[in-house]
Amino acid sequence: MQKYSSKVALSSLLLVIFVISFASSAQEDTREILLERRNELQQNFLNLYDQERYQQSILTASEILNITQKIYGPESPNLINPLNNLASSYFMVGDFEQAIKLFFECIALIESKNNISPELISPLVALGLAFNKSEQYNKAVEIFKKALHINWVNSGFYNLEQVNIHDSLTESFIGLKNLEEANHHQSFQLGIYNNHFGKDSIKVDESLEKLAKWYKRSGQILSARLVLEELLDRQVNRDQASKELIKTLQNISFSHRREGISMYDSVSPLKKALNLFAEYQNQDLRLKLEILLDLGDTYTSYGRVSSAVKAYQDCWQLIEEDSTLRPEIEERFSQPVRVRSIFIPKRYPLNQPIENKQDYKQGFLTVRFDVETTGKTNKVSIIESDPSELLDRVALSAIKSTIYRPTYIDAEAQRSEGLTIRHEFTYRQAVEEFTEPTEPVIEDKPLENPIA
């Protein structure tokens, strides 16, 4: 009897082992199937994302996340990449609320293991960008500064990887209308390049050029010119008769032209650029075309019509040296191009902070005008406006003061008739409380220009 009981117990034990082994084998098979499916979906996701089919990629990324949770559990580090990918897809379709939620989940998983991990930087920057896009600029600043701190802890104070974070912080401070802080995060990059490459490196020239572009973009004309003059000194000291030096001279000319104070200071750098071009052995006539266009536009903006005409005709003369330039030159002169532009307000009333966007509505107006062979506008009139007459007077004044490079056909200036501009703006609904502005102000954005 005892022998029989032992046999039964042994059989039961073998059965349990067999069941456990079978279940374990089945689980392993299921896991392998899920992993294989996950790999297929991951490749599909990458293809969709590369093809910019972001809406479709959301479904794939969601399935990848679900499978990863089944395989590894809800708190596994293996969820970091799937969360980041899904958040990125939502970001690309403009669903910033969902993107922000998922980026936070991704960051929390990483922080649960190491709260200063360099792995945090990428999702933190992405989260900051999502806050920027949704105009939550204070939150964006907080996140970007956290990313910057982690970057410094892991890579040192002057590493190059931080540059993109400073650029993103600049955009946040633009949103907050804090120009001082925006300037800081652009100028700080110059110190990074000086420290990393050495002050005599040509890489520092690239950083100076980037800083000058920032000052130009933000309407800080004098600051831009000071940086450009420093860049010019560096290039001249290298005896560098190069395209880069000519480009710097063009940009210095443009900064003077935007101020509109001294025609001599605006024209002189361009004449130096033409002299440098003449010294080149392998001459790029397209570069000469850009200089001549700048020269003509500069003369036009100061009302020196005859000098402008000569510069524009010199552009057409280039066709005799290289007939392949004809299509490009014809295209550049095919329609009027603004060389001096006046700002029409994008919001009314002027200089009033927006406290509640719901108080504002969308308005528009359409202006019709001609451009004479001198580049001046004529027969300026409002075709339509809604609300009527709210910004009509300031728009008329702005277009009347705008100066164009006229259309040219075969080196002859042409009159352009019936041109139209549609301008959209926002206005506070209780517009009757305010009076219409009487004078436009000079636009603080870069003008349309071949070197812009």
Give residue spans per PLM region.
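Bacterial N-terminal signal peptides
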Residues: 11-21
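Hydrophobic packing position at a conserved site in alpha-helical tandem repeat units
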Residues: 68, 106, 110, 150-151, ...
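Mid-chain, structured segments of secreted extracytoplasmic proteins
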Residues: 68-111
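Structural signature of tandem alpha-helical TPR/SEL1-like repeats
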Residues: 98-101, 139-142, 146, 181-184, ...
